């Protein structure tokens, strides 16, 4: 199979974690079994990601607090502190859906081989570009979006990888996902502009004499008051904290996804799969593979040529160097079923087997996504396929609690510093 693991895997530990709290213990356990250089690489990579989130925090602070500070609805320091707290809560409670939506902009070949030198170079290139641009725009006071920056760096890495590996640019980036996210980034400000403008026009028409239309200077000159009316002030404060919370749940997840890429690249044995998965979750994954095989055979008339069902069969073998090819789907399913047969705990699998299982799952999910876009597949079957994809990835799309807390702290503290 393709190269596995990271340098230093299996060496005796040169970095011994001290005993600590239950939350920090899993984080410090990272370094057990790693030699000094691999441990330092891990520290450097994690520092890069957390630095990106820290910069993201102070870079985007103004988005949430500018209105409440300008209108005197809140004192500046209190507004920034509360914004940081709500950013922190947004990361903690936001889940990991956005995290993996961003990660899957990368081509599947890079994702299944992220534990190689090229995969690690990809992560450092993305982070270096995003950090440099965010710092530069912040320093010169240029409005910029951290999300646009990160997505642009991901697309750049995907295209560079396509050029280096002699594959077409069409395959070098997950363009379907890129278009979806790009449309969201374009539509969001337009929708915000239209909704906000519409509400303003309605309020000006229905309540033309309301105090809410006065600027802070006008209110101070006319009413000798510096704060907005109570209800307007309450709405401003709630909306600012809501923006902070949503920013945390959205932008914070990007950091979670990046940290998971780093962990999978440097210490793959511990993070390629969620080793805390329950027996039920593993059974769901194994059953999804069986149902996926049945699904493809059930729709052989539509999918037979794309998946090479007539030639592949369950008896075919995978090539020695694994690659994600739709025509190897049935052998991939067979290999996955063989690796998971009788498994009730991922910890029982060897490190190499866990890496293989992740590769198979990511490849099958990517192929299923392509199958769902084919013409001739009934809507009901597409819905079934989508559910199977969710079951396949339930133990690969996750994040440990310490990762979420670390990103939440970096983003929240960065917001307060901003």
Protein language model annotation of sequence segments:
Residues 1-7, 11-27, 268-402:
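Low-complexity, proline/glycine-enriched hydrophobic segments characteristic of transmembrane helices
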Residues 33-34, 48, 96-138, 142-144, ...:
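Anion-binding (especially nucleotide phosphate/pyrophosphate-binding) glycine-rich loop
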Residues 39, 43-46, 50, 115-127, ...:
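Structural signature of hydrophobic alpha-helical transmembrane segments
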Residues 40, 44-55, 82-85, 238-249:
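Residue-level signal for short hydrophobic patches within transmembrane helices
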Residues 46, 50-61, 87-100, 126, ...:
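Transmembrane alpha-helical segments of multi-pass membrane transport proteins and ion-pumping complexes
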Residues 67-75, 152-164, 261-267:
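Interfacial segments of multi-pass membrane proteins
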Residues 72-84:
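Membrane-interface alpha-helices at helix entry/exit sites of multi-pass transporters
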Residues 143, 151, 155, 159, ...:
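Glycine-rich, mobile lid/loop segments that gate access to catalytic sites or pores
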